[in-house]
């Protein structure tokens, strides 16, 4: 079984040989803007891929990386990137939130892939298409959980939202 580690690489410079680690795959998603998040993927202690993005800064944490089937989904800045390991293969990168993607989740009963963004909660497919995306009155900074049939997000003002997993509509 291969081990995978996600590293915060705030000082990494793309297309430079003057980095602490050398990654064989680089993807800069910043579009020419200043990168606020750079995450390295290390497999079995070997640096394999590095992803950089603009938007709100993110650091690796327990909900940054999701393994679903044979693919991994990684939150980097305002993006979700999809890849597999053994050998490494990059599939796609998806701008999932206008500001920041806080985490990537999978509902255990339905298999729905959900991103918890700062401004939006979104459901996306394994092929990188957004099925629905919805927002609230304020930023979703005070909590997030998946339940059978709905995603629950709490905004900055403490308002609780329950979004149906099938369509993203607010449930009572």
Protein language model regions, located:
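Acidic, small-residue rich beta-repeat scaffolds with periodic aromatic anchors
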Residues: 143-172
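Short loop/turn segments that connect beta-strands within beta-propeller blades
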Residues: 85-87, 125-129, 165-167
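WD40 beta-propeller blade core
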Residues: 81-82, 122, 161
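Extracellular-facing segments of soluble proteins and assemblies that are Gly/Ser/Thr-biased and enriched
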Residues: 65-95
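Structural core positions within WD40/WD-like beta-propeller blades
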Residues: 73, 113-114, 152
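A short beta-strand motif characteristic of beta-propeller blades
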Residues: 46-56, 89-95, 129-135, 170-172
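Short loop/turn segments that connect beta-strands within the blades of beta-propeller domains
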Residues: 68-69, 76-78, 108-109, 117-119, ...
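Repeated scaffold domains used in trafficking and secretory/extracellular systems
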Residues: 2-30, 50-70, 95-110, 136-150
